[in-house]
Amino acid sequence: MAKKSSVEKNKHRAQLVKQYAGRRARLKAIANDETLSMEERFEARLKLAELPRNSAPVRLRNRCEISGRPRAFTRKMKMSRIAVRELGSQGLIPGLVKSSW
């Protein structure tokens, strides 16, 4: 089980990403638009830098929905390998069969 503070910190970051997504996209579009003047683009970059750092989607960490584990994360199931193995062994994941040879 991951530290609760780490999981909560990531949840807060996800909330900030969602909150600032529109504003960030607008400013990025202005900053990358080559038809505008350099001053306007630079101003957009400065405003982009003023946004909270944790509102950047890059700072989000994929975490297991069950344990909060940050590593060995399976995107398709949103779980870590350990959680997938445990639930798969119990037969709680449809279509997942434990292999044996």
From Swiss-Prot:
InterPro entries: Ribosomal_uS14, Ribosomal_uS14_bac/plastid, Ribosomal_uS14_CS. GO terms for cellular component: cytoplasm; small ribosomal subunit. Gene3D superfamilies: 1.10.287.1480. SUPFAM superfamilies: Glucocorticoid receptor-like (DNA-binding domain) (SSF57716). GO terms for molecular function: rRNA binding; structural constituent of ribosome. PROSITE patterns: RIBOSOMAL_S14. Keywords: Ribonucleoprotein, Ribosomal protein, RNA-binding, rRNA-binding. GO terms for biological process: translation. Pfam families: Ribosomal_S14 (PF00253). It comes from the Bacteria. HAMAP family: Ribosomal_uS14_1. Binds 16S rRNA, required for the assembly of 30S particles and may also be responsible for determining the conformation of the 16S rRNA at the A site. Part of the 30S ribosomal subunit. Contacts proteins S3 and S10. Belongs to the universal ribosomal protein uS14 family. This is Small ribosomal subunit protein uS14. It comes from Beijerinckia indica subsp. indica (strain ATCC 9039 / DSM 1715 / NCIMB 8712).
